[in-house]
Amino acid sequence: MSVAPLKNDVFLRALLREPVPYTPIWLMRQAGRYLPEYNATRARAGSFMGLAQNPDYACEVTLQPLARYPLDAAILFSDILTVPHAMGLGLDFAPGEGPRFAHPVRDESDVAKLAVPDMDSLRYVFDAVRTIRRELDGRVPLIGFAGSPWTIACYMAEGRGSDDYRLIKSMLYGRPDLLHRILEINAEATRHYLNAQIDAGAQAVMLFDSWGGVLADGLFQQFSLAYTRRVVEGLTREREGRRVPVIVFTKGGGQWLEEIAACGCDAVGLDWTVNLGAARRRVTDAVALQGNLDPMTLFGGAQAVRAEARRTLDAFGPVGKGGHVFNLGHGISQYSPPEVVSELVDEVHTYSRALHAG
């Protein structure tokens, strides 16, 4: 596939801690339910899976936030649970309930059935990547993504989201051998999955370790970070003559920043509970940092959003050699006012230009 030259590479350069004229911004879940146009497209698709498995619809919703806001990156519209769905677990999104699996993995016989899926069963994702790259026409880079081996294992064992992670932790403490087997398969599948996204045209990739923070110290390193590192070490790191940066985001992982930064990634995502300046000192500019505005700030109105954006940028400190990508500390809420997002993007671009020029 012939691709257009990249017109705005500020996001990629920031991830590699190269000089940039301003701090780039994109938002986790930027293509989502807070946008009326997303909801209209989802209604046409008939269901979440109908949306995610149709490359044209996936492309349409991926591009919707870029039509509204001058964001510095697009992120593939998909879901972290596509990989276990391809393993045969039967993913479904029930209205008002979120994702659930028809065939959760809870005992030895379930684990014995697991295998790395044929990537051809995920072709709709890679077709979407190619379609989005074509339609972006070099406007901004495209981010591919996957869930971390631990996070998707949580969903696989629980069968849905969880408040206490009782089932996955029962396996962790009672049959760690089974959990390690699941994680080995997940890591191998995720490596293949992200590399296929890169081959299809993703210019950066992100690993969402959404539930790493529910683990105790010591267990995080053993059951989450070790398998995240395994994925990162197996990724294609150069394509189209450029490095393909890797971002790792562990929600609730603030106490392990130094260890996460050493896993081989180019950038570490931060949730809103972490002091950005302190995080930068802890990782000593060895990696870029992404984040970390509290998503609930968007409900405080334009003035509060602009003030908090400036505070976040100031917290990072002198731009120097440190790379910073502005983002929320978690995904944007479906109830966020779209007009306030405009205020956020404008403030980040305007205020950070002055910081970088100074």
UniProtKB/Swiss-Prot annotation:
Gene3D superfamilies: 3.20.20.210
Cellular component, GO annotation: cytosol
Reactions catalysed: uroporphyrinogen III + 4 H(+) = coproporphyrinogen III + 4 CO2
Superkingdom, natural source: Bacteria
GO MF annotation list: uroporphyrinogen decarboxylase activity
Site, Transition state stabilizer: residue positions: 79
This enzyme's EC code(s): 4.1.1.37
Pathway in which this enzyme or protein is active: Porphyrin-containing compound metabolism; protoporphyrin-IX biosynthesis; coproporphyrinogen-III from 5-aminolevulinate: step 4/4
Chain positions recorded as substrate binding sites: 29-33, 48, 79, 155, 210, 330
Assigned keywords, A-Z: Cytoplasm, Decarboxylase, Lyase, Porphyrin biosynthesis
A biological-process GO annotation: protoporphyrinogen IX biosynthetic process from glutamate
Subunit (UniProt): Homodimer.
Family: Belongs to the uroporphyrinogen decarboxylase family.
Name the UniProt record assigns to this protein: Uroporphyrinogen decarboxylase
Gene responsible for this protein: hemE
